[in-house]
Each structure stands twice: as structure tokens, then as C-alpha cells.
């Protein structure tokens, strides 16, 4: 089976796109996964390690073709508050629980979770159900984006 062996970040625009895959959040963080593009191109995602694919990234196939990654619409909870301070407070509580969040200028999007939705309501926030692409923050320890360089582990722990 044809393999996707590398990924270019959304900012890198090199060459034409041959097909497109639309994936939900869970399926955009994989190492190996059989895929089928919207135009029928079948291939195996076969990366050296699990990698978080972002909206607009491009998968590079071993035969030189390129497949654009799109984020699928998902059921999300949209959190809003009446002030920026309250929104920051809610963001702090969500971060304290290590939840994936999508930060926008005036709202926060999270995956549906009735327990968390109740918690943010108790903090004074409003919660609405929306359907949107979910592309959350990487987090402080996620590393430098799409840098695929490995230094090895050849030092002595002795």
C-alpha cells in the first residue's frame, strides 16, 4: 500500500495538492492509519512516531503526491463569559485539568463533556453546543511544531 511518510506544516506551501483527508481530532494524532482521500486516493499514514496533524498540514506520500489534512467538524462546547478576566479564569481551570482547548479571542472551545460543562457554568460561564473543526492548542510541552529531527540517546546515564 502507498505510504505517507512525512508531514509539512500548514505554513509550508510546496507543490500541488493531489487529494484531501478530513479527520477528527483523535484521528489527527496517529502514527499509522489507513486513509482514503475525498478523491479516492488510498494510502497508509506511516510516520516514524505519532504526530499531531493540524488543519492545513500536508502529508507527503512516498511517490511524491501530496494530501492536505482538514479538521472535521465535531460536536463541541463553546464557552463564553461576560469579561476577559472570567474567560481567563475558566481557561485556567480547564488547563489545570489538562484538557485540550481551542482558544479564540472571545471564547473557548472544548470537546463535549457534561462534567466540565457543569463546572464552567458554576464559574459563571455560558455554554452552547456548536459543531466546528477542533484544532486545540499544542500545550507547553508539545515541542517545536513539525520539526522531525532526532538527536538519539547516546549519552551515558551511568
What are these regions (language model features)?
Residues 75, 107-114, 133-145:
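Short proline/glycine- and acidic-rich turn/helix-capping motifs at secondary-structure junctions
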Residues 67-81:
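Short glycine-/aliphatic-rich beta-strand segments at the starts of folded cytosolic domains
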Residues 53, 59-61:
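Short, well-ordered loop/turn sites that connect or cap secondary structure elements
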Residues 1-50:
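Intrinsically disordered, low-complexity, positively charged segments
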Residues 138-158:
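Histidine-centered metal-binding segments
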Residues 1-17, 84-123:
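Glycine- and charge-enriched low-complexity intrinsically disordered segments
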Residues 85, 127-137:
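Flexible glycine-rich active-site/ligand-binding loops centered on an Asp-His dyad
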Amino acid at each position: 500500500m502507498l505510504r505517507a511518510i512525512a508531514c509539512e506544516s500548514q505554513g509550508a506551501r510546496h507543490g500541488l495538492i493531489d487529494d484531501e483527508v478530513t479527520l477528527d481530532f483523535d484521528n489527527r494524532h496517529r502514527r499509522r492509519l489507513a486513509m482514503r482521500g475525498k478523491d479516492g486516493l488510498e494510502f497508509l499514514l506511516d510516520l516514524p512516531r505519532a504526530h499531531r496533524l493540524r488543519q492545513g498540514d500536508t502529508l507527503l506520500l512516498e511517490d511524491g503526491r501530496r494530501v492536505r489534512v482538514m479538521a472535521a467538524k465535531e460536536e463541541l462546547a463553546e464557552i463564553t463569559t461576560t469579561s476577559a478576566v472570567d474567560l481567563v479564569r475558566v481557561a485556567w481551570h480547564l488547563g489545570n485539568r489538562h484538557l485540550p482547548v481551542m482558544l479564540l479571542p472571545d471564547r473557548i472551545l472544548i470537546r463535549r463533556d457534561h462534567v466540565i460543562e457543569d463546572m464552567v457554568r458554576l464559574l459563571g460561564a455560558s455554554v452552547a453546543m456548536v459543531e466546528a473543526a477542533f484544532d486545540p492548542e499544542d500545550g507547553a510541552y508539545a515541542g517545536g511544531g513539525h520539526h522531525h529531527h532526532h538527536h538519539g540517546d547516546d549519552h551515558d546515564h551511568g
